[in-house]
Amino acid sequence: MLSRRGHRLSRFRKNKRRLRERLRQRIFFRDKVVPEAMEKPRVLVLTGAGISAESGIRTFRAADGLWEEHRVEDVATPEGFDRDPELVQAFYNARRRQLQQPEIQPNAAHLALAKLQDALGDRFLLVTQNIDNLHERAGNTNVIHMHGELLKVRCSQSGQVLDWTGDVTPEDKCHCCQFPAPLRPHVVWFGEMPLGMDEIYMALSMADIFIAIGTSGHVYPAAGFVHEAKLHGAHTVELNLEPSQVGNEFAEKYYGPASQVVPEFVEKLLKGLKAGSIA
């Protein structure tokens, strides 16, 4: 009998041909008609909380199940929102304000990935588990936020997404529907399906290089991306403070602070591009 993870992977793989064609028509990895000898590699990067920690973004502590001293069941589940929407809104209001403090800035790792995108153009895709906007502020544009975005909210009835930089109050409603509906954070909570999974799995099937940065390897489906990339022949790289739960799956590994190991690896990769020799 298939596990929940197995059911999800099976469902995502069913329509590969149609989704692959759709991905080719989008910006990501679209220039496959270039002769093979002239091609730049297709690089897919996955980032987790470890890349933003050095910018001052506090991370969820899986060991004790707390996030900013709150139980995740209370502030990061649909059931928690149903029980106490004001608590949940207050929690994300505080996170939203923190993200916009002047001391919270992209670090050297974010800037290095923006430099890598500049070199690769539309053969680069960044998938992040983070809900902050530090990648965009560093200059990345080809970004999929699989866990949502803190500076957005969505209608709890229609799902329409709105940019939102201030606090959300009980009086704030979405008026896209016939009757005003409550707003909720545009964040994927525990028990909800991550966003953009069709595109992510198609990109994994087309990537030449897969790089995971600052991830724990505890949370699926993201923890399974390295295995999926390997199935399709990608070279795999882990850049992390310490080995992740799936660290043994990677062909190449570098450990240390993200602000150190990411710029170093990007420089190595760019030198290889210029020399015509990529891992």
From Swiss-Prot:
Protein name, entry field: NAD-dependent protein deacylase
Domain comment as written in the entry: 2 residues (Tyr-92 and Arg-95) present in a large hydrophobic pocket are probably involved in substrate specificity. They are important for desuccinylation activity, but dispensable for deacetylation activity.
Catalytic activity: N(6)-acetyl-L-lysyl-[protein] + NAD(+) + H2O = 2''-O-acetyl-ADP-D-ribose + nicotinamide + L-lysyl-[protein]; N(6)-succinyl-L-lysyl-[protein] + NAD(+) + H2O = 2''-O-succinyl-ADP-D-ribose + nicotinamide + L-lysyl-[protein]; N(6)-(2-hydroxyisobutanoyl)-L-lysyl-[protein] + NAD(+) + H2O = 2''-O-(2-hydroxyisobutanoyl)-ADP-D-ribose + nicotinamide + L-lysyl-[protein]
Biological source species: Escherichia coli (strain K12)
Protein family: Belongs to the sirtuin family. Class III subfamily.
Residues bound to substrate: Y92, R95
Binding-site residues for NAD(+), renumbered to this chain: 48-67, 129-132, 214-216, 240-242, 258
Active-site residues, record numbering mapped to chain: H147 (proton acceptor)
Alphabetical UniProt keywords: Cytoplasm, Metal-binding, NAD, Transferase, Zinc
